[in-house]
Regions:
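Short glycine-cluster motifs
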Residues: 1-34
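A contiguous loop/helix-start segment that scaffolds small-molecule binding in enzyme catalytic cores
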Residues: 25-27, 35-147
């Protein structure tokens, strides 16, 4: 735990998912998926219209509604990551698309507490992991051109 650093940014980062990346996503939104009245936040529909990375907290019970909104906007192929129990020994990660993530969540039995990340930045996870491994295996100092 780092005081002042939100799980909305820290947990994706621990899985090599940046919330912004030059040329991919210029901004991000953090949304509570489920309101106090146990309804889907109306901000999710607004976010589905955007090209920003969308980070949804407390949204697993509304996953079906969330994916339906993104599909209505023609975003069924947009990458999605679900990170359950991020930064703990029980962490689990599911990767898919808007169209496939419900199946992946069921297959891996992903439940709350979880963070849902929707956006093209999810596709950069593997590349960033490779770069990280390169830095860990070599004593490289300086700027990496792929970052």
């Amino acid at each position: 735990v780092v005081p002042g650093i939100s799980s909305a940014v820290a947990v994706p980062t621990l899985q090599n998912i940046p919330v912004t990346k030059r040329g991919v996503a210029e901004s991000f939104r953090v949304i509570t998926g489920t309101t106090k009245a146990h309804k889907l936040s109306t901000d999710v529909a607004l976010a589905a219209k955007s090209n920003a990375t969308v980070v949804i907290l407390m949204g697993m019970s509304k996953l079906s509604e969330i994916t339906a909104l993104f599909c209505q906007e023609g975003k069924q192929n947009v990458p999605v990551a679900i990170i359950q129990s991020g930064s703990t020994a029980n962490e689990k990660v599911g990767i898919g698309t808007v169209a496939s993530i419900e199946h992946e969540a069921k297959k891996q039995q992903l439940t709350n507490p979880a963070i849902i990340i929707i956006g093209e930045v999810v596709n950069h996870r593997q590349k960033l992991k490779e770069i990280q491994n390169e830095f860990q295996t070599k004593e490289v100092i300086g700027f990496h051109p792929d970052l």
